[in-house]
Amino acid sequence: MTITTLSRQNIQALTPYQSARKLGGNGTIWLNANEYPTSPKFQLSGKDLNRYPEPQPQRVVQAYANYAGVSTENVLVTRGGDEGIELIIHTFCEPKQDAILFCPPTYGMYAVSAETAGVLSKTVPLTDDFQLNLPEIKNHLNDVKVVFVCSPNNPTGNLLKQSDILDLLQITAGKAIVVVDEAYIEFCPEASVINLLKNYPHLAIIRTLSKAFALAGLRCGFVLANPELIDILSKVIAPYPIPVPSADLAEQALRPANIATVQALTQELLSNRQWLAKALLVLHQVEKVYESEANYLLIKCQNGQAVFKALWEQGIILRDQNKTLHLQNCIRITVGTRNECEKVVEAIKEVK
């Protein structure tokens, strides 16, 4: 008997999520994790470090409720959006009995979180234009307790049709929780489904401070949902989920003055995205630049592996999507500073 064989069988078979940091690389330009290219500057108060944190940091809850336009009863603060995903699976799915459903190509943590919890996964691939295949989803809802969709979708960058999300909510009513992952919604706020919360008690929305707020290192996310759903998740969440320093910085980030700064910087980044998309389109190595509503672009290359490897060797770290369903020869590029974007274009231009 070894330590490994003592572990649960599903954990022994688990392929862990390959985060951008885990994949490593000796980069000088990091455009593989959809992080904001520069760090904000906040000052830690240093108060109450000798005390355990609040179960839910009330000033952060109130500040995010104000920002999102919901009641504090609709907000649960989590350790990044990923904890929200895990919480929902652990709360609603019986291991080895219930399933989640998601639609690849999409964010990899839905599958990993389910597998870690011993919960089954069902997949219904997106259509050729990366939209929901509603008839097939409807045919696969048996034993499904949670449906995950991502809009803007990672890694494709496109928005899902709100009419399709509405249809999904209707066909799952009384059967399953629908989770809409809005990690990138600050780049297209008009596309949020937050106004649907009042009419659909089985809707949950994942949010984060990791993307437009430039606080990926903070690990602060949110679940937005109706009070009954929030109350159930609150039974499962760890007693002290958000460290005092994280709550301190999150509260500062959600002050009106900083929100205005985030919105201005977001416009600058969207300008960089537009420039990068146009510059990539004229390169002979690039076959297609997909439309994006997020802070990254998905491109299809003649030889994606060659482009990825050539830039990796130059210290420009992108995200290879070649093994992702329907994304052969594709690469995801985080939109960085204008200087970083220019270096990416010049480097791809030199690939033979």
From Swiss-Prot:
Entries under Pfam families matching the protein: Aminotran_1_2
Any single GO BP term: L-histidine biosynthetic process
One Gene Ontology MF term: pyridoxal phosphate binding
PROSITE patterns: AA_TRANSFER_CLASS_2
Organism whose genome encodes this protein: Haemophilus influenzae (strain PittEE)
Presence of keyword Transferase: yes
Pathway: Amino-acid biosynthesis; L-histidine biosynthesis; L-histidine from 5-phospho-alpha-D-ribose 1-diphosphate: step 7/9
Gene3D superfamilies, per the entry: Aspartate Aminotransferase, domain 1, Type I PLP-dependent aspartate aminotransferase-like (Major domain)
Entry keyword Amino-acid biosynthesis: yes
Cysteine-cysteine disulfides: none
Residues making up the signal peptide according to the UniProt record: none
Name this polypeptide is given: Histidinol-phosphate aminotransferase
EC number: 2.6.1.9
Protein family according to the UniProt entry: Belongs to the class-II pyridoxal-phosphate-dependent aminotransferase family. Histidinol-phosphate aminotransferase subfamily.
UniProt keywords, alphabetically: Amino-acid biosynthesis, Aminotransferase, Histidine biosynthesis, Pyridoxal phosphate, Transferase
